[in-house]
Curated annotation (Swiss-Prot):
HAMAP family: Ribosomal_uS14_1. PANTHER family: 30S RIBOSOMAL PROTEIN S14, SMALL RIBOSOMAL SUBUNIT PROTEIN US14M. This is Small ribosomal subunit protein uS14c. One of its GO terms (cellular component) is small ribosomal subunit. GO terms for molecular function: rRNA binding; structural constituent of ribosome. Binds 16S rRNA, required for the assembly of 30S particles. Keywords: Plastid, Ribonucleoprotein, Ribosomal protein, RNA-binding, rRNA-binding.
Length: 100
């Protein structure tokens, strides 16, 4: 189980990313439209003035049950060992262990 503070920090980053998503996207589109270097620099300054935690690269996928940051399956939003436990106890419909 991840520390509660790390999980809360990740939730805060997700909120910030959603809040500034449209602004960040519009600034990046402007950069591609503008051809003058001086105008591009102004737009880059605006982009850099946004909060650092609002960048999508700062987000980390976490297991929604345990908060574990590694070995996550995107389809289920679960870490590997929780996914395995849920499949073994038949809590995930349609998921089966492979055998050949």
């Amino acid at each position: 189980m991840a520390r509660k503070s790390l999980i809360q920090r990740e939730k805060k980053r997700k909120k910030l990313e959603q809040k500034y998503h449209l602004i960040r996207r519009s600034l990046k589109q402007e950069i591609h439209k503008v051809s003058l270097l001086s105008e591009k620099r102004e737009i880059y300054v605006k982009l850099q003035s946004l909060p650092r935690n609002s960048a999508p690269t700062r987000l980390r996928r976490r297991c929604f049950m345990t908060g574990r940051p590694r070995a996550n399956y995107r389809d289920f939003e679960l870490s590997g060992h929780i996914l395995r436990e849920m499949v073994e106890t038949c809590l995930l419909p349609g998921a089966m262990r492979s055998s050949w």
